[in-house]
Each structure stands twice: as structure tokens, then as C-alpha cells.
Swiss-Prot record:
It comes from Streptococcus pneumoniae (strain ATCC BAA-255 / R6). GO terms for molecular function: arginine binding; cis-regulatory region sequence-specific DNA binding; DNA-binding transcription factor activity. InterPro entries: Arg_repress, Arg_repress_C, Arg_repress_C_sf, Arg_repress_DNA-bd, WH-like_DNA-bd_sf, WH_DNA-bd_sf. Keywords: Amino-acid biosynthesis, Arginine biosynthesis, Cytoplasm, DNA-binding, Repressor, Transcription, Transcription regulation. GO terms for biological process: L-arginine biosynthetic process; protein complex oligomerization; regulation of arginine biosynthetic process; regulation of arginine metabolic process. Pathway: Amino-acid biosynthesis; L-arginine biosynthesis [regulation]. Belongs to the ArgR family. Gene3D superfamilies: 3.30.1360.40, Winged helix-like DNA-binding domain superfamily/Winged helix DNA-binding domain. It comes from the Bacteria. GO terms for cellular component: cytoplasm; transcription regulator complex. This is Arginine repressor. The gene is argR.
Length: 148
């Protein structure tokens, strides 16, 4: 199966079922006679723009552009390696390759307090409206990250 067709199949599966692990996705692909390695599947998920959300004590994959409105700070806290602040800008450190996916989620779910994002490979800049908002977000992120 071609990559484009495989991506379409994965998107279809994600919209029809709440799949929590790459293994579940891989098993569903195999049921459609599509065999992929874990490495290929990871790359596919990143290219498609899938991320995990936690809702009602369930964790499952969703397409980034189809995420429901979420508690952005709580969501980010589950995906960050570190947080720093420079005046009105938050510097969020992620695992390699996750910053751009998280930037898309922030952009889809942002409110009037967030102006925009800039993403690198493992660093996400969140530009807040002012220093006060950045400080509030930083404090809440650090609090939530302590509990992980």
C-alpha cells in the first residue's frame, strides 16, 4: 500500500475509533492486510499530525486539526520536558519532533491571551499577550508538571 493510502486509512481509523496505542493502530492496519514497522508507524503518525488527548480518564489519538476545545495548559503539561519564560514568551521544551504538533494544537485552541506560536524540533515558543498571562501559564504548567 502506498504511503498516501496508508495515511488515509490511519486517519479513517482514528476518526472511527478511540485508539490509545501505536500497537492498537498497527493491529488495525494488519487487519486491513497492511504491515508496517513501529518506526514507519511512528513517522506516519507524526506526518499525519496525530496527538493523544486525555478526556474522561481516557487517553486516545486524535487528528490535530480536529481536537475539541481542551484545557490547553493541562494538555501541554502532559507533553513537556521543561518550561521557561522570557517576559511575555513561554519557552516550552518537548521531546524531539513534538514541538510542531503541539504548536498546531495551541494554535487551534488558543484564546485571546495567546497571540501565536513558533516551533522548532523540540522547542515551542508561545507568545502571550502580556507578561502577566505568561507568568500565570508558566506557574500553572510547572504546578501540573510536578504532579506527573
Amino acid at each position: 500500500m502506498r504511503k498516501r493510502d496508508r495515511h488515509q486509512l490511519i486517519k479513517k481509523m482514528i476518526t472511527e475509533e478511540k485508539l490509545s496505542t501505536q500497537k492498537e493502530i498497527q493491529d488495525r492496519l494488519e487487519a486491513h492486510n497492511v504491515c508496517v514497522t513501529q518506526t514507519t508507524l511512528s513517522r506516519d503518525l507524526r506526518e499525519i499530525g496525530l496527538t493523544k488527548v486525555k478526556k474522561n480518564d481516557m487517553v486516545y489519538y486524535v487528528l490535530v486539526n480536529e481536537t475539541e476545545k481542551i484545557d490547553l495548559v493541562e494538555f501541554l503539561s502532559h507533553h513537556l520536558e521543561g518550561v521557561a519564560r522570557a517576559e511575555f514568551t513561554l519557552v516550552l521544551h518537548t521531546k524531539l519532533g513534538e514541538a510542531s504538533v503541539l504548536a498546531n494544537i495551541v494554535d487551534v485552541n488558543k484564546d485571546e491571551w495567546i497571540l501565536g506560536t513558533v516551533a522548532g524540533a523540540n522547542t515551542l515558543l508561545v507568545i502571550c499577550r502580556d507578561q502577566h498571562v505568561a507568568k500565570l501559564m508558566e506557574d500553572r504548567l510547572l504546578d501540573l508538571m510536578k504532579d506527573k
